[in-house]
């Protein structure tokens, strides 16, 4: 049985001490520290590019930047607890009964980690909601200007930051953990529920994004206009929906995989050793790798949209739709 947390301080067994002294495990922890370090560069570049990207609608850019900030929050907490674990492995192995950390000592890392994970999941839903409002009520959405994005961003921030406090409301934080990467001892069941909710949310968001993308494609035909400005706005709206679609799909897959694998690990934790549990944790916890791929994906999509914008402008300028062609496109849209 894996003892990764306990109500009282417990001494590390010989197998766990051997794991902490293993150079292969030390190398894996060092690699884990490099991942958030490298991701910081890409996260910064992605924010800079989004701030200077005029082809993506402003509300969408705000939510994309919020996603990056939540990813950065997660990476900082992940780096902190890995560094703390390295410190334990190098300097505290001569005190096997004092290797564990209290849930109270780990609270700041746990808060940041939970905020980052929940925030990334909710911003995906917020982006889809923003796109749904923009596609369904374009005139009203334009009049509201910054209201939708402000409301969605504030909602996501409040829920993400308060999640940890709600889950640990009845936890005195007096339990002990092998390291700060584990959930508080008395709140494990609540965090399991959180992982389940994130998994179901990812599945729901995936289905919703597919519907939104199909609807955006159809809108190009439904709202075909002879005016260049309206056709251009329709193209921009579709491009933003494409960006949100691709990013949300990747987020849904990564959030679903991370939540599902972590939930599985917590289920089988009672039948495996602490050494096996610690080894599987580094493999199953995929959120850090998602955080390094997310900004790279955003930058690639931003470049793609910029190219499509140029192609779209050239094609719209050369487009001379006739009345019969307009009717044919409308009939095709409704068929």
UniProtKB/Swiss-Prot annotation:
Gene3D superfamilies, alphabetized: Rhodopsin 7-helix transmembrane proteins (1.20.1070.10)
Membrane protein topology class: Multi-pass membrane protein
Protein location: Membrane
Protein keywords: Membrane, Olfaction, Receptor, Sensory transduction, Transmembrane, Transmembrane helix
Chief location bin: membrane
Gene Ontology cellular-component annotations: membrane
Organism superkingdom: Eukaryota
A UniProt-annotated Pfam family: 7TM_GPCR_Sra
Any coiled-coil regions, as ranges: none
Extracellular side: 1-22, 83-107, 171-192, 256-278
Entry keyword DNA damage: no
Gene Ontology biological process terms in this record: detection of chemical stimulus involved in sensory perception
PANTHER family associated with the record: SERPENTINE RECEPTOR CLASS ALPHA-10, SERPENTINE RECEPTOR CLASS ALPHA-13
Protein name from the UniProt record: Serpentine receptor class alpha-13
Lineage: Eukaryota, Metazoa, Ecdysozoa, Nematoda, Chromadorea
Gene: sra-13
